[in-house]
Amino acid sequence: MTLPPLETMMSKNPNLTLTGPDLAALLCSRVCHDVISPVGAINNGLELLDEGGADADAMDLIRTSALNASVRLKFARLAFGASGSVGASIDTGEAERAAKDFAAAEKKTEVTWSGPRAIIAKNRVKLLLNLFLVAYSSIPRGGTIEVTLENPELDAKFKIVAKGKLMRLPPKFVEISTGEVEEAIDAHTIQPYYTVLLADECGMTLGHGATSEELTFTADVIAA
């Protein structure tokens, strides 16, 4: 099935107005939000042990929650953090492993990844992972996500296709990327904001499209 033309955004998006301190604060809030649930579950498991509860159930809860927290922190380190020195490059294989582990921890979405493995600019990897998060949020009941990389070292193109029940283009991502934001950015909307900011920094155009069967998210290098 041929998708309709993707809606795109050009560089220097007028919505990108957050100061550095505000951006850092909101990203920190986002990371804390992502890990507080599994960390809280670990604490619950320890309380069960203290109260003499079923050791097997408590240990299973602790083990599963610790894995979930670890996976989320590793993903956040690549997607939001410095992950090395300023200007460093990152292996796309690390991004693939982080994305697959992230989805596997919740056991509701299958991720396939295709394209050449390469060492590319850090911000491109961060953009790829944040675009993955946008796609992941578009299928809240789970499903499949297909990630395709083309020529990642030069005139890169990233394409992510999401399929699942109750799929929907994330409204805040659409608003921010098309310049139609009506509400202030907060901890719940900072991730799509950061995705658009990364695309701007990388000189890449974002696109999105939808059919009854799938949602498509793209990032392409802007032609000189």
Regions found by a protein language model. Give the residues of each.
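Conserved signal-transmission helix
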Residues: 2-22
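Conserved short strand/loop->alpha-helix "switch" segment adjacent to the catalytic nucleotide/phosphoryl-transfer site
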Residues: 16-26, 57, 108-136, 140, ...
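Conserved ATP-binding N-box helix of the HATPase_c
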Residues: 25-54, 123-152, 191-201
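Glycine-rich/acidic phosphate-handling loop/turn and adjacent ATP-lid/helix
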Residues: 152-192
